[in-house]
Each structure stands twice: as structure tokens, then as C-alpha cells.
């Protein structure tokens, strides 16, 4: 018996140990070969895989549904500190064992703390998939979290904070986040502050680990030379399937609202340029207008051919770097323009940026620009799917954000369906600089 819902096909014969294996990407008849498979295990672990023909490697990752967005002001940076601390040793591996485990096999191991998730990722030859699953399983489930290691790792993170503060085009984004989101966790620094990092203790790390690092809050994804049943067997042998579901009490996150338009300046006389971020609330991940937003954002500041690059750099020569940025989250987004210019030309450069943005916000894009933008976005989407790591991340986001998995053809159809009315709508709503928060850093303020 086969039950079909949209582009998801579940076949009773595919059930393993009472757990349905879902093939995503097939048509309703099941005739098309699926490109992604998903299994939700009884202990709450979500497992996704995508076999990539011709690949000889596998990207394997685990995402924890806990990060900066779920922290209190007093514990700002605890998610990032825990991500560091798991590498200091586990029940089976020393810190050196972890460092050598995959690199000596020609692979790589890394971790990232983001606003909504913390991820642990590996890239290995296909024959070493089990090694990757074992090592990341140890990091996620069995860290030692020792007091002596914490004292050392605090010093490392304080150095990381200093490095960011010494890099103007890094620190200005932290300043802008605080200006845009205020006291909401969206405005927190992922690294934390010096005071919060110094105050965090082992009890804080153990409490976060106990609450969040369990199968019920985990998504595992793999892409490359991997079969779904093979991945499930590897996870079973590595002990992932025997772990208890864990505490599923939701994290309390207050609704977010962006600050109104205003300007802030951080005086820095020790740098030679004024760094500027002009930005505001962006589009949420699940907003169906996301692709129209992407086209406007890309044509405004997405490359050498963009309106801002051509105007500010090529025509006026006022900046070396000028570009747009965009981050989408489950509940909101953040986007804007970054540029850096000499103190005596920074205001002129900012005025030019505003002029271009006003034009886009008022008029949207011409039909020729929209056609070119669609063509460019289609190309970027396809190119982004060439690597197994990017495909792994795309697979994980289907579970993390509750998004349907879309084949390349389906994505191309969504891009092609973007119309001028939707473009004008998102341009008016999101790209008017008069609604944005302005932050500058350098010897001289702009307004």
C-alpha cells in the first residue's frame, strides 16, 4: 500500500523496524527517482540522505536545535562555548584523538554555532562514513566538559572576541545586530561578551547539553556516495539509534520586532576607513516571496554587475567593497548593505547607496532586469548544488525549517514564476533605506 502526499511517497514495504522511510522528490506515482530520503526514528532522530551519482566522498552533519536564539542575556555565548568544549575530549576520545580522527584519513571536521542551530560537520571519503558518524556521535552525546578544559577554552574564546573586535568588517555586524534587534536574542553576539564568557561555568554547559543534545532535537543529514539504508545502519552501529529522545520542552523565544530607523556610530580613530552597515528586518525563511526577494537583493548588491557595485565603485570610485547581505530565519530575517570608504568620502558613498535603493524601492525592477535576475538566480542555485556539503545543508534545512524538498526542476519553476508585482512588493517592503538602521564605525560618523 502506498500513501502519497504532494511530492512525498511513503511505501509500507519500505518501513524498517516500524519506522517509515520517506522518499522525497518523487512524483505522486513514485515513477521519478527520489533524490532525498528521510527517516524519523522512534527516538526522535531525523535522518536525511541524498545519493549523489559520481561522488566519491560523503558530507555528514548533525544539527542541534539550540543556539544563540535560545540563550538568556546572562548566558550569552553558552551555545558557542559548548560547541568548543565538546572538542576538548569525550568518553572515548581525547582532544588529540578528535583532531587526528578524520584529518589523518584525508577528511575534515568542523563545527559552527549559528543563531538557530549548532552544527557538527565532516567531509570524508565514502569508505570512512562510519568514522565520521562515530566521531560526531561522541562529540554530540559524550563530551566530558571538564573544569580544567573550561578554563583554557575561555581564554581561546576571549582571543576570538579580540580578533573580531580587531576586524572592523566583522565587529560592525555585531554592532548592527544589537542596534536592529535590541535586547532580543537575535541581537546577541554569538560569541558572547567577555563578561558572559568569564561567568559561564561547567554547570551551565552541562545543563544546556542535557536539555538540547539528544535525538529529539537532532537532525542528521548526509550527501554524496551514500545510500539511505547504509546511513541508517552506520548510525545504528555508532549508537545514535539507542539514545533516548530527551527533554522536548520548547525553548521560550519572545516575538521579535526590529527597531525603527535610527543611526549609531562607534568612534574608532585607529582605522583608515569608515565602515557602514545600512540594514533592516529581512524576509523569513518560510515566506513564499523569498525567491523574489533574492532576485532583488542579488541585482542590488550581489556581484560586480550589481547596481550598487556599478554605481558606488565603478562610476564614482568611492569604495572598494560594497555589497548586500541577507540572513533568513524561521521567524524573521536581517538584510542590508555593507560598504567601507575613506572618512572624507563615506557620506558621499552612503548617499549614493541610498539613491540606488530608493530607486529600487520605488520602482522595483524593469522586465529586462527581472529576466536577467531570474537567469542569474537559476545559475547560482544550480552551481550551489554541485558540492556534496551544500547538498547536505540543503537536505538538513528541509527538516530544520519544515520546508518541502524541491528538485532542481521545481526550484527552476519557482524562480521562473517570479512576477513583477511580487518584486515591487518586496522592494517596497524591505529595500527602502529610510526604514533601515544605520551603523558606522571609524574615524568619522555618517548620517
Give the residues covered by each predicted segment.
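Charge-rich, well-structured scaffold segments of protease-associated domains
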Residues: 1-22, 34, 40, 51, ...
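Short loop/turn motifs at secondary-structure junctions and domain boundaries
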Residues: 29-31
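Active/ligand-binding-proximal structured segments within catalytic/core domains
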Residues: 44, 51-102, 288-300, 308-312
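Histidine-centered active-site/metal-ligand motif
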Residues: 80, 84, 228, 275
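Internal nucleotide-binding/catalytic subdomain
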Residues: 258-262
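A domain-level signal for the structural core that forms small-molecule/cofactor-binding pockets
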Residues: 278
